[in-house]
């Protein structure tokens, strides 16, 4: 029987029941405790989402309906954010998440690739957990927020993390865990506007602080297509013309580094995907649905973009993801 290419979804979420219960009322979905959590009555769409994030069989069923062969699964940090906890408690919660993800991968190795979570408030705890995830659990993708306690990931505080990630061959998947500014709670703007802003901020941090210069071998995947950053970088490049001192840590204009990132397709608008492809190339883009709460037909979405020809479709739907994950593209 002839082999065929597989479709890989790089952006799919899970929930660990105990961690989710502990996080209830403490995350961005409740305004960090300012309002009640949304109910999920039996039979509701929200109840189905939670089941798909807690039960691997339910997630696999959803994947198959979408035409997805493998999913890279990460904690839904907007629902079960662990940053509310003390560093030691956060470590305990993140370990529960990582162990659950490793169990899903062990039980269904042909369907899941794992992402591990880290208590980044304390690198003395986070770095050993990263080593455990890689060497004991066999997970090579880190599920990272945009910032920790208001400090973005490019800052010197996190350089030891990037050094260790580089040594361990870790892939970084950056997904903001929600904006704490209460202004964004109205109309759920934390999700529609706040997340793309956070992605632009963390990308700026990584570029300007020289992380991409120092660790070019670390592959960084941006959720939600990198937010606003890829579409407004001209202002950054223009700024360094007037202020060359802002290039203290970089050798090129900021926009040059856009092709150093990978981006998922969780954009919801085919013309935005076309614009992203024009900026960075189809070989830097990975299919990502934000399952189960996001794009319901991620494969069909690719076909709606005018710039996605057969070659680009192959790259985005799975070829590039398999290459950076080190797994076969055909089965």
Residue ranges and their predicted role:
Residues 20-30, 88-91, 130, 158, ...:
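Aromatic- and acidic-residue-enriched segments that line the glycan-binding/catalytic groove
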Residues 76, 120, 176-180, 291-293:
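Short glycine-enriched loops at secondary-structure junctions
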Residues 91-95, 102:
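Portal/gating segments that form or line small-molecule/metal binding sites
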């Amino acid at each position: 029987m002839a082999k065929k290419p597989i479709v890989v979804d790089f952006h799919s979420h899970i929930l660990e029941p105990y961690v989710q219960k502990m996080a209830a009322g403490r995350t961005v979905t409740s305004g960090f405790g300012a309002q009640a959590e949304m109910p999920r009555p039996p039979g509701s769409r929200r109840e189905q989402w939670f089941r798909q994030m807690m039960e691997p069989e339910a997630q696999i069923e959803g994947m198959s309906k979408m035409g997805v062969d493998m999913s890279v699964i990460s904690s839904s940090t907007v629902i079960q954010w662990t940053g509310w906890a003390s560093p030691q408690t956060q470590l305990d919660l993140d370990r529960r998440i990582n162990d659950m993800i490793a169990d899903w991968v062990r039980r269904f190795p042909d369907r899941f690739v794992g992402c591990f979570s880290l208590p980044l408030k304390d690198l003395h705890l986070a770095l050993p957990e990263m080593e455990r995830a890689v060497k004991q659990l066999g997970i090579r993708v880190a599920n990272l927020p945009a910032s920790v306690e208001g400090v973005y990931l490019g800052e010197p505080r996190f350089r030891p993390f990037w050094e260790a990630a580089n040594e361990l061959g870790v892939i970084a998947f950056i997904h903001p865990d929600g904006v704490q500014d209460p202004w964004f709670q109205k109309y759920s703007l934390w999700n529609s506007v706040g997340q793309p802003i956070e992605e632009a901020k963390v990308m700026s941090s990584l570029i300007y602080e020289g992380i991409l210069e120092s660790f070019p071998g670390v592959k960084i995947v941006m959720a939600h297509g990198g937010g606003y950053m890829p579409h407004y970088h001209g202002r950054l490049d223009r700024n360094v013309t007037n202020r060359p001192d802002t290039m203290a840590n970089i050798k090129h204009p900021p926009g040059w580094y856009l092709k150093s990132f990978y981006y998922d397709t969780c954009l919801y608008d085919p013309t935005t995907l076309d614009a992203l492809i024009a900026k960075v190339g189809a070989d830097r883009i990975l299919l990502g649905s934000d399952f189960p709460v996001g794009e319901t037909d991620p494969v069909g979405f690719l076909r709606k973009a005018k710039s996605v020809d057969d070659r680009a479709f192959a790259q985005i739907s799975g070829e590039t993801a398999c290459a950076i994950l080190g797994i076969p593209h055909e089965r």
